[in-house]
């Protein structure tokens, strides 16, 4: 990946201190997607990186995974599959629950969206603890798909998501790695 493009993408992401609570450095991707040149560079970089790797579907998790996953799928001429919270998908679904800091959450996938033999790229905006993507990967595998990689715009390695996904056999690709929470 082009180092100059990666620096441009990183410079387009604003950091908001003490949001949503004191001590947190919030990584704001809206500043990136508001900038047409930076947004296009991000999509083009991911699409080009994965173009010749046999990917058959792009999966994005609710909600910001849609922002990046759908245009990457379009740029690659592939279908986009949304993974959503309960009650948002109209057809038959499979679901996977996962732990949060305080409680659990659940994600759903249409039962016919991924078929055996699909080689899937998971795209999301940010990798923190990895819980959401780990649940997404479990859904894809239960549906018979193979997860090629999980690609993120931002990774926060100190929160353990990179290690968690790698331990689960998932290759992690992040355009920008940032310190902090």
Curated annotation (Swiss-Prot):
Superkingdom per UniProt: Bacteria
NCBIfam families in alphabetical order: apt (TIGR01090), PRK02304.1-1 (NF002632), PRK02304.1-3 (NF002634), PRK02304.1-5 (NF002636)
InterPro entries: Ade_phspho_trans, Adenine_PRTase, PRibTrfase_dom, PRTase-like
Protein name, entry field: Adenine phosphoribosyltransferase
Keyword NAD: no
Entry EC no(s): 2.4.2.7
Family: Belongs to the purine/pyrimidine phosphoribosyltransferase family.
Keyword Transferase in record: yes
Swiss-Prot/TrEMBL keywords: Cytoplasm, Glycosyltransferase, Purine salvage, Transferase
Gene Ontology terms for molecular function: adenine phosphoribosyltransferase activity
Assembly, per entry: Homodimer.
Catalytic activity: AMP + diphosphate = 5-phospho-alpha-D-ribose 1-diphosphate + adenine
Biological-process GO terms, alphabetical: adenine salvage; AMP salvage; purine ribonucleoside salvage
Pathway terms, separated by semicolons: Purine metabolism; AMP biosynthesis via salvage pathway; AMP from adenine: step 1/1
Coiled-coil residue spans: none
Function: Catalyzes a salvage reaction resulting in the formation of AMP, that is energically less costly than de novo synthesis.
One Gene Ontology cellular component annotation held by this UniProt entry: cytosol
A Pfam match: Pribosyltran
Localisation: Cytoplasm
Gene for this chain: apt
